[in-house]
């Protein structure tokens, strides 16, 4: 039976990427060696790292604009701490938008290092919307936001305007839509949504913003050290970086971010259309802030829930259960999710 994987992450990856990756685990580059047993400093893997870095900057339209791409470890969760370590000055202040669980966690970590001003929060309505009316302080070192909220199904459609540094956690929607990525001074994203398997974390940073905090930074948390060592200060996550390279090449061959955005819009509009037109379902997030990556919805007649769950199971649908803090259902429709799988879900909703 064909499976339809709506998991929030780790999540679906392109089938051709999985095939290439599995072959490389057995015999990488016709070396008669596995990808996961070669030296990370071999010419073959150095070429992988360089190609992956170049693909990131090309797909985000950040080539020759002063940015570099890093592949680190510790997930986006470690970036919650690395970001203030590298950007928050001694006795400085940063501003944060609180739009969900992950932004709340980033705030908690940043407060360990300095004065953090939470300038707006949607916690009053269980994070089901994106705050819009807030004032950005002038005396901050940076402003931090989270572009997409996997748990609650909200997504920022526009971003704050500030004369200070702008930082964005794009873990769950990077490479999914066309935006001006140059408005950000630092972007970070865990790989396990639109890039590859868990194990590496992408950081895209403007190099000239670093080294200005006046604080001592542990080596493993210092972006400048990782830049100087080409993301190899310690042994990199060889397999996740390689799969990320394959996924980004797949995206480039597809036509890049502009092409995948059209596909993503079609998938989301198909599913949201059914949610809005079917009285048995209702969306969990404010309509104007709905995520095109994580579609959260509720069933309005609980007497039909067990039947719907069984229908999904019989159809090979996986990973549809909503997060415990929201309940209901969450269909994660990342870049690699085919629209045919979304149609299978919509057909079930219509037949309930």
Question: Which residue stretches match the model-derived regions?
Answer:
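PLP-dependent aminotransferase-like
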Residues: 77-143
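PLP-dependent enzyme catalytic core of the Aspartate aminotransferase-like
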Residues: 330-352
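Active-site phosphate-binding strand-loop segment of PLP-dependent enzymes
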Residues: 9, 110, 121-174
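Conserved N-terminal alpha-helix of the aminotransferase class I/II PLP-enzyme fold
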Residues: 32-79, 86, 101, 109
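Active-site C-terminal subdomain of aminotransferase-like
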Residues: 14, 191-272, 286
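Conserved PLP-binding catalytic core of the aspartate aminotransferase-like
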Residues: 281-311
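A glycine-/small-polar-enriched, mobile loop at the entrance of the PLP active site in fold-type I
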Residues: 2-53
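Conserved active-site segment immediately N-terminal to the catalytic lysine
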Residues: 167, 180-192
